[in-house]
């Protein structure tokens, strides 16, 4: 009899079979589920603390997604030969899993929960992120931890006008869409996508399609829970002290309402701090015992109620706008004198200084992903220091939020970048957030597009982004355009849309409540389009099209094509020729397998010199053409003349002069530069040369060779030097 109480559930999902197992591996975790989708295997474990820490005022959920290199049959390439810090993909996948599950833990549940996902086998054609989301949903559901799930998840592609479920790497190459959607049976909770300028209708259809497909996984998880679920924790939210709540509300409400009439963020924040301090002082003065953490939580609830009720009642928003108005926009291009491209994009109290840098192919980011190595020639980095929100904070390594915002901005812009053939540069864009009050990632999209155009990148279209919010109470709702930071915190949805005048290039949605309908998403998309068109108009006014010339400080790229068989000649023995070329011309030279050569230089003259020398190295000797070159070797029967780099020809003794030549050394010396004409070449690449063909014939010379010369000196019937001597 086995020591394991193993339970397995399998289901067909599109063209793939999904197998879920629990009860055999990681049995000491609160919940553990192994998911196998066509040889991609992930293990999701969940552990929850039975008690919340004293004074805990937020839900401490941690999600760690970890890819093991052995999953793809690889050994880590680092010095220590073991997995190191999380890659960007691991960080993004951790966020992707965190976002849909976080809203499903009950309000007031502050016990620490740690979710760990290991990818332990990988089929490159089956993405591990979807398998991981299903595994986490199942692990939480069987664990007994309070969780209002399960969730389902699906990836959606769009190929030939049809939606495709969970397309693999190969299928995605021909897809116009890469969208991941997650949600419960009742509602969508999270969307992450990039698209090739698709319409709002197609995007919404993809969300609905993915949500429906995710329900297949939810049904299977319900079956797994019925057979293997642990008892649900006997957890109850802390009882509310209604008397104390009423006391705090009476002390705070008027002060908070007054604070939310202040339109400036800094002044409003200061007023809110003073209101909070006043409430605490009043409670102390009245001798009321209280927990400061709980009072702060109550004040937040009161603030949310005030702001939400005002908006639903049709009153002005926090900064005085109505629900559809975009904050004032200011744009300045070419902000920095020596960068390749720059733009300052300001929308209300959100500001991004975005800088673009152009580099060569060698500057491309080489990524050793689990599914295979690849090069990325478009890099986008987002930085948000503490001063952007007027706060004191630590500066350290890049945070998960910064990585996520940078990836969203990159996804928004990548659809409108020129192809490598059109613009062979590696591009790095850095968005420095200098002020933030809502939607800094979308400001990065707008500023990034303008910065790229300022750098001379021929974008296919202007790209703008906008963040939408939602306030929903029962059947009443209001969609907010261009949300502020406070509206993000106090609202029910963060809905970011980026795109061009033709369609959407990126869509990200995070919903904190259940019950968001298709109709609400439709309204949000329509309102976002209206705002996007407004911002695009402002951007087009500021910069109608990309600069036609790149910065004088950027490297100039020149391309040329050579016969692939000549690549080794350009590289030379041990790379000697290519090293000499780069050192002597000051250029970077990159050679591809198809014979395409890219020359990067700061000055056109240097590039021209490098190009000329490469042309010399790869040139073919032409019959009938006159060349000038040095004598490289004297032979008894002639001399070897260098015609082109690495290419010599034989000047036979009979072709040196019209008169009879007894000794080659009487006419030629090594190093002497002479003009010669190419008489012929053979299929082995041997070249026959003549000097006398270029010299005037002496008077009285009949032109007939002397008997000893007929047949070009009978001692050499092969007509010249051996093949080895010519080479």
From Swiss-Prot:
Domain of life of the native organism: Bacteria
EC number: 2.7.7.8
Positions of the S1 motif domain: 624-692
SUPFAM superfamilies: Eukaryotic type KH-domain (KH-domain type I) (SSF54791), Nucleic acid-binding proteins (SSF50249), Polynucleotide phosphorylase/guanosine pentaphosphate synthase (PNPase/GPSI), domain 3 (SSF46915), Ribonuclease PH domain 2-like (SSF55666), Ribosomal protein S5 domain 2-like (SSF54211)
Described purpose of this protein according to its UniProt entry: Involved in mRNA degradation. Catalyzes the phosphorolysis of single-stranded polyribonucleotides processively in the 3'- to 5'-direction.
HAMAP family xref list: PNPase (MF_01595)
Record's protein name: Polyribonucleotide nucleotidyltransferase
């Amino acid at each position: 009899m086995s020591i394991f109480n193993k339970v397995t559930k399998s289901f067909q999902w599109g063209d793939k079979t999904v197998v879920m197992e629990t009860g055999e591996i990681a049995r000491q975790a609160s919940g553990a589920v192994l998911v196998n989708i066509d040889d991609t295997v992930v293990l999701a474990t969940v552990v929850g603390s039975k008690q919340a820490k004293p004074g805990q005022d937020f839900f401490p959920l941690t999600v760690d997604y970890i890819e093991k290199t052995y999953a793809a049959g690889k050994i880590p390439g680092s010095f220590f030969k073991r997995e190191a810090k999380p890659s960007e993909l691991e960080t993004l996948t951790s966020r992707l899993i965190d976002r849909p599950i976080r809203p499903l833990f009950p309000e007031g549940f502050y016990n620490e929960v740690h979710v760990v996902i290991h990818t332990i086998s990988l089929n490159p054609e089956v993405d591990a992120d979807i398998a991981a989301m299903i595994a986490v949903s199942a692990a939480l559901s069987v664990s007994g931890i309070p969780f209002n799930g399960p969730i389902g998840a699906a990836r959606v592609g769009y190929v030939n006008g049809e939606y495709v479920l969970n397309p693999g790497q190969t299928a995605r190459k021909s897809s116009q869409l890469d969208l991941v959607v997650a949600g419960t049976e009742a509602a969508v909770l999270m969307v992450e996508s990039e698209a090739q300028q698709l319409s709002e209708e197609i995007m919404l259809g993809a969300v609905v399609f993915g949500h429906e497909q995710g329900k297949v996984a939810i049904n299977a998880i319900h079956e797994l829970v019925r057979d293997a679920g642990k008892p649900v924790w006997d957890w109850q939210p802390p009882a509310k002290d209604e008397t104390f709540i009423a006391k705090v509300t009476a002390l705070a409400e008027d002060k908070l309402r007054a604070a939310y009439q202040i339109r400036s963020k800094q002044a409003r924040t200061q007023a809110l701090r003073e209101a909070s301090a006043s409430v605490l002082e009043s409670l102390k003065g009245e001798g009321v015992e209280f927990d400061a953490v709980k009072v702060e939580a109550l004040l937040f609830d009161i603030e949310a109620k005030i702001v939400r009720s005002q908006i639903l009642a049709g009153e002005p928003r926090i900064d005085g706008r109505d629900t559809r108005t975009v904050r004032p926009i200011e744009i300045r291009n070419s902000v920095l004198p020596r960068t390749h491209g720059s733009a300052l994009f300001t929308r209300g109290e959100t500001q991004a200084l975005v800088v673009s840098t152009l580099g060569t192919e060698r500057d491309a980011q080489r990524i050793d992903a689990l599914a295979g190595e690849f090069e990325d020639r478009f890099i986008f980095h987002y930085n948000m220091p503490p001063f952007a929100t007027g706060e004191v904070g630590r500066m350290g390594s890049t945070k998960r939020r910064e990585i996520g915002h940078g990836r969203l901005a990159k996804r928004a812009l990548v659809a409108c970048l020129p192809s490598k053939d059109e613009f062979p540069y590696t591009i790095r864009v850095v968005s420095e957030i200098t002020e933030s009050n809502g939607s800094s990632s979308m400001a990065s999209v707008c500023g990034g597009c303008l910065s790229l155009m300022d750098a001379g990148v021929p974008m296919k279209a202007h790209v703008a982004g906008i963040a939408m919010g939602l306030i929903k109470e029962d059947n009443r709702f209001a969609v907010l355009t261009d949300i502020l930071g406070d509206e993000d915190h106090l609202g029910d949805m963060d809905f970011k849309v980026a795109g061009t005048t033709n369609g959407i290039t990126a869509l990200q949605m995070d919903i904190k409540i259940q019950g968001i309908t298709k109709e609400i998403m439709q309204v949000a998309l329509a309102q976002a389009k209206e705002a996007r068109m407004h911002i695009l108009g402002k951007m087009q006014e500021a910069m109608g099209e990309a600069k036609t010339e790149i910065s004088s400080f950027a490297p100039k790229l020149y391309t040329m094509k050579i016969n692939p068989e000549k690549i080794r000649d350009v590289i030379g023995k041990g790379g000697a020729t290519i090293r000499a070329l780069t050192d002597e011309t000051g250029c970077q030279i990159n050679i591809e397998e198809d014979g395409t050569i890219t020359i990067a230089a700061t000055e056109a003259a240097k590039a021209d010199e490098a190009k000329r020398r490469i042309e010399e190295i790869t040139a073919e000797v032409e019959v009938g053409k006159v060349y000038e070159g040095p004598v490289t070797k004297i032979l008894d029967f002639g001399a070897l003349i260098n015609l082109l780099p690495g290419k010599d020809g034989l000047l036979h003794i009979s072709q040196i002069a019209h008169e009879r030549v007894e000794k080659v050394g009487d006419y030629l010396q090594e190093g002497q530069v002479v003009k010669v004409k190419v008489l012929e070449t053979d299929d082995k690449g041997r070249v026959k040369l003549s000097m006398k063909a270029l010299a005037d014939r002496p008077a009285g010379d009949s032109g007939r060779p002397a008997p000893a010369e007929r047949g070009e000196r009978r001692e050499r019937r092969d007509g010249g030097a051996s093949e080895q001597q010519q080479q």
